[in-house]
Amino acid sequence: MSRKRNLWRGLTTLTASLLTVSVAAGPVVDSYRTDIDKFLGTKSSAMVTDSTDEDLYTYKSDYSSTTELLDSIEDLGERMSEEGTVLLKNENNALPLSKDETQKLSLLGFSSYYPVQGGDMGSSLSVNKGTDADTVDFVEALNAKGFGINEDLQKLYKSLEADFKTEVNMWGNIMEYYHITAPATDGVFASKEPSQEKMDSVDDKWKDSMDDYNVMLVTIGRSSTENGTYLPGVDGVDASQDLNQTDPLGLSDDERDLINAAVEAKENNGGKVIVMLNNANAMEIDEIKNNDGVDAIMEIGFPGGYGFYGVADILSGEANPSGHLTDTYAVTNANSPAAQNFGNYEWTNADPSVNINAEEVEAEDIYAGYKYYETRYADTVLGQGNADATVGSSTGKAWNYDDEVSYPFGYGLSYTTFEQTLKSVDVDLANRTVTAEVDVKNTGDVAGKDVVQLYTSVPYTDYDVENKVEKSAVQLLDYEKTDMIEPGESQTVTITADAQDMASWDSSCENEAGTTGNWILDNGTYYFTVGNGAHEAVNNVLAAQDQDVEGNKDNVQTWELGDFDSSSFAVTLNGTPVENQLQDADLNNWMEDTVTYLSRNDWEGTWPETYKDLTATDEMISTMADDYSDIEANGDPSSVTFGADNGMTLANMKGVEDITDERWSTLMDQLTLEECLIRTGLGGTSTKVIESITSPEAIQNDGPNGFNSYPLGQYANSDASTGDPCVIAEDDPNRDYKMGVMANETVIGQTFSKQLAAEWGKAVGNYSLWANTAIWWGVGTNLHRTPYNARNHEYFSEDAVLTAGQGAAIIKAGHDYGVLIAPKHLAFNDTEINRTGIAEFMTEQAARENELRGTQSCIEDANALAVMTTYNRVGCVTSNAHTGLLLNILHKEWGFKGLMSEDFIQDPAYTKIRMAVHNGVTMTCNTGDNTMAAVEAVWPYWSVENASQSEELLTDLKQTMLYQNYALANSNAMDGMSTSTHIEKLNTWYDNLITGLRIGFGVLTVLCAAMYLLGLKKKEQ
């Protein structure tokens, strides 16, 4: 009997322990419920709408099935590459290929078989096999379009597949790639192109196979990736390979040998050599351009999942290329002024514990990209500013444009020819417009589209020199693309540009606020012209100035401004007087007279030095280290209302566009303080439910090439009884489709088509409705400051106006479908090196005229209701905490009134949540459940007790929640909701499991205890 009693006692202890664990599991699960639900695909609550006669679905899809949706995306992907591929060289009309030639294709280069179709990270290609829109690579596209391909070469390259594999460690996850990869931020570029010797060892007859397949297409690839970079010059190359490569974006000997092998084969077989550039970072290709044996060069970017269909159409002539370069293709990238300060420049007194790691001084001022090359060229022609000095020269001799630029910004060829005539230009400062009319005539033999690029050249005066205001010799003012024009036919294109894009920021000029910092227009002659790129445009202007250049002075219009103008743009469209907001971004503000910024007044004397091995001052260290965690008591906290019972829900404000409507204040008064603290502190992956106002969870998706985070069906509605027109059945074959399939943003930029950009916004909007995900961190509006940032594929261009035009078109079109499209990253995400903490320094003029101008239009013109900030610092201040940038420029000057998230920082101290909320950041990227315990585990000071002391903080919290819920109310997150919608708790299978375990272990504990006690009683008897 003793053994039985011991058994029951042991079982009682065991079951009681398990009961305790199962009881304790409940609160633990509740703390991580949101993350658990996302991982398991379960739901712990639901928005339930009572029966109603009103139309619950404000936003409607253009498609009645997922098949139609995917077909439209596939079609757009093909057309994006048809119009976004840039034909750079086409000697003797080598392209398009004849029908016979399409059957004789020899593909050379491992990127022909293993192409780069998206970024390695952040915007990687979604491979959607087994759906209604399978993605294709180059070979698959050629086969589908009926091309004949050299199978011997294909077998050779496929046999080397193992040699192409690269393993990349992405934060502990080992990713395998079978295409060329970009180096990590601390790495160098290593060529993967097989050598001639390697190819001979596999098949020594491979060259003979090109006798019958005598159209040799050589693909040269360079990948891009988030959290990666190319370093300028030889420092960025794996020297151990000994491949005579002087820059990671230049050719290696293996690539040269491959091109030369194709040229040699051409001499024997009478064929053609086409070089295809599969890249997003502008490469050094002057030797290819000047190689007489190369007949054609095509820049295809990263075509995404369907773009190779378009590339094939261009080769065959089914499509006529109409793309133009979004970047200058320099002879030597490392010689640009911006490249003098692109690298790993750590502080001598770095402190990694608070992310004080590195700096980058943008000493080139406004002169990045074509603004440098074309301005310096103009000054050499004009004989001013020591422009022909040797600094920055690729030859070591006097600087000469032809030695520095292979292909200019905006350049692109067609299979036909066009003639553009600038008929008129009207400048209307009162309405802030510049209106131009351009006649475009197809003077060739093939139908095609043309791009009209309107450029301006503004006065550079003694005032500018004295006040350190820089002026580009030419700048893109706006652009449009024609319809398809038949041979001999014409089209008149009207361009209406923003006149503010002619203005220059003058940090010393007085303004309406009585301080300094203003937009100015100098008195003098303003020139307007059109051309096939910036170089043709500047030559037209120089010709009009009676300079001896190859320009067309008859294609120039002028406008005279009699008096200096500092009033036309002194007040923003939002009614806010402008003033300096970014003076602390200038390193000279912290370390006096440290930086000499480049000026066209003296190219030689102001040429940038490399600012490295700097020691941050005590003031800088203090500013960078401050986490703003001290929440001081202030004001009258009781004056800020929380928890009111006003009987409203967010559905009452559905579609209300007036943010000053007093009902918003009534609704916000219902919020609890806990809800505000939780929502601002934990915003990663979704906005989460707010019960007091029945605000829905809005799922976030990432990736500039499409919704890359989740499959189409993961959050889709599968309940047809709801009346949702975008229900996806559980057995729908496209549930697992992922949208990361579009060509990279550089290709979208190369289309120079606002219409195609708008179609992409439409596609995103439709997909959002079907996927039930309302937020897309998708439009990259940073600039290609240099070709070396390995994240350039996520951004359109080196030019702000092109960035603004394409970005705004996408966002505006997406609005029609209720998707919240966020431009990112605000601002100056110019490098991935040390990106969490790097201090970016620049002048306010450069900041406003270059990168910020690209985002400004997305807010002012497209009314973006979402924005993402950056990892980096602006000067010494984390972007989240920079009041000048976020509160004063973004909100007050531009009128932004939407939700805003930090980037994926997840570092509590670096996030600086107190200042972030003050500046309008509505949520961090941290994740956790809807509990204060989850918040305080990250930010112990972000508590009800501390917040309750500060009227300022309470006011800021309610303001950010207004921004966030205003955005949601004007989005498709509200589809299916009405004022009758309420939240109902749901038991998931794991809730039922825990409940079952509690009951089971409870019963077993009681039973075992009873048996044990019964045994004791028998013993006593």
Describe the residue ranges of each PLM region.
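Short beta-strand elements
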Residues: 536-579
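Glycoside hydrolase catalytic-domain context in secreted enzymes
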Residues: 1-515, 522-529, 534, 579-1021
